From Swiss-Prot:
Natural source organism: Chlorobaculum tepidum (strain ATCC 49652 / DSM 12025 / NBRC 103806 / TLS)
Keywords for this protein: Cytoplasm, Hydrolase, RNA-binding, tRNA-binding
Similarity-based family: Belongs to the DTD family.
Protein name as annotated: D-aminoacyl-tRNA deacylase
Enzyme class: hydrolase
Length: 150
């Protein structure tokens, strides 16, 4: 599993020009599911993200987590995180999970991170054409990948 985690002052998802979901201060998580991901990958990522100490403390050091600041999460599925553009100019997506599997795993991930984070969690709509808006704070952007299997 691969995620792009962005610290935001606000973020939202619109679909067809209509606001679908939004958060204030917190994290926007773009989540990619690979064809090899398992429940272990989802659990690892669900524990990692809410506990990342990427928010500044009173001394200006990245020392506070989402849980510490009482922030929110906006989680958006993004299969293009597994794009491979190493050959040619059109990316391939053979590493991405097939849509049926990705939907199931994404829903489980959202459930799991809701439980782990204990904060408001909003989402996009799996497979929809979404417009994602954000005000990046910092900017702080972290790319996470679940540990490789032996």
């Amino acid at each position: 599993m691969r995620t792009v985690v962005q610290q935001v002052r606000e973020a939202s998802v619109s679909i067809g020009g209509e606001l679908h979901s939004s958060i204030g201060t917190g994290l926007l998580v773009l989540a990619g599911i690979s064809r090899d991901d398992t429940a272990d990958d989802l659990a690892w990522m669900s524990r990692k993200i809410p506990n990342l100490r990427i928010f500044e403390d009173e001394k200006g050091k990245m020392n506070r987590s989402l849980k510490d600041i009482g922030g929110a999460l906006l989680v958006v599925s993004q299969f293009t995180l597994y794009a491979d553009a190493s050959r040619g100019n059109r990316p391939g997506f053979s590493e991405s999970a097939p849509p049926e599997l990705a939907r199931v795993l994404f829903d489980r991930f959202v459930e799991s991170i809701r439980h782990e984070a204990g904060c408001p969690v909003e989402t996009g709509v799996f497979g929809a054409d979404m417009q994602v808006s954000l005000v990046n704070d910092g900017p702080v952007t972290i790319i996470l990948e679940s540990p490789k299997k032996p």
